[in-house]
């Protein structure tokens, strides 16, 4: 009941933020596009995973309609991989425990699994849909802020990276250090903070905790969007660029880091 009440409270706050942003934009003669926060069923992902994928996996070792279900540590530590209905190559990692999204304090709990390495490993499903191997820096992971999502179950988007985003990060890879620094350029029309993680760092340093401890003073991640993109650093070192951006609805920015991903996977056709 407490979790449901918290979700309802956040939905009310989201609507209020968006209403205020829209009023300011109208007063300024601007036009902004708000996310669809009135999605028909905001529990659709949770229902699919909890009521279908997990029972099928437990009873028949068949994760359908999900692509995969991992329950080695039990449902509180498990996750499912589901092909998203949008896009040719997009998949989602969805925890099998109830976690609403970026506003959940569970994200910082010491017993929460680090879902990001498993999401990265799921790039093989993206490659299968693309019908080719994809370079390390062609893949990205994203979680949208509480203001930009349509579902009230945490999910990590897994897909190809937008070609211009890949090119920009490659051109500035030497400027991205191991602490949070604001990028001096925009990605898809918005500014991000970035930091360098080595290949093992994604498992050793949970991005949720990295953002909460080093970037968000209050530890409140609700309006943050997080993106992880594969990167090639100096001397061929593989790693990741961790990106974080705070939603600012009064400026028409709802924290939709998923914009950095390309659900048509144009990179697969380019190389």
What are these regions (language model features)?
Residues 7-10, 23, 158-160:
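Intrinsic structural disorder/low-complexity segments
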């Amino acid at each position: 009941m407490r979790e449901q009440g918290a979700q309802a409270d956040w939905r009310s706050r989201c609507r209020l933020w968006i209403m205020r942003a829209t009023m300011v934009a109208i007063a300024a003669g601007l036009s902004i596009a708000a996310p669809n926060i009135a999605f028909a069923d905001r529990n659709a992902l949770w229902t699919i995973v909890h009521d279908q994928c997990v029972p099928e996996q437990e009873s028949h070792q068949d994760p359908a309609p999900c692509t995969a279900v991992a329950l080695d540590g039990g449902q509180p530590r498990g996750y499912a991989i589901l092909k998203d209905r949008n896009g040719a190559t997009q998949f989602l990692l969805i925890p099998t425990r109830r976690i609403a999204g970026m506003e959940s304090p569970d994200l910082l709990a010491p017993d929460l699994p680090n879902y990001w390495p498993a999401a990265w490993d799921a790039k093989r499903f993206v490659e299968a849909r693309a019908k080719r191997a994809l370079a390390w820096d062609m893949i990205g992971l994203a979680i949208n802020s509480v203001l930009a999502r349509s579902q009230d179950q945490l999910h990590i988007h897994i897909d190809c990276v937008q070609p211009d985003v890949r090119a920009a990060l490659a051109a500035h890879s030497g400027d991205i250090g191991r602490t949070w620094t604001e990028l001096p350029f925009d990605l898809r029309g918005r500014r991000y903070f970035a930091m360098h993680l080595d290949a093992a760092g994604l498992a050793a340093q949970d991005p949720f905790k990295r953002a909460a401890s080093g970037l968000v003073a209050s530890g409140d991640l609700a309006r943050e969007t997080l993106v992880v993109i594969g990167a090639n650093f100096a001397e061929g070192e593989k790693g990741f660029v961790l990106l974080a951006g705070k939603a600012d609805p009064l400026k028409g920015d709802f924290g939709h880091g998923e914009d950095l991903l390309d659900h048509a996977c144009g990179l697969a056709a380019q190389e």
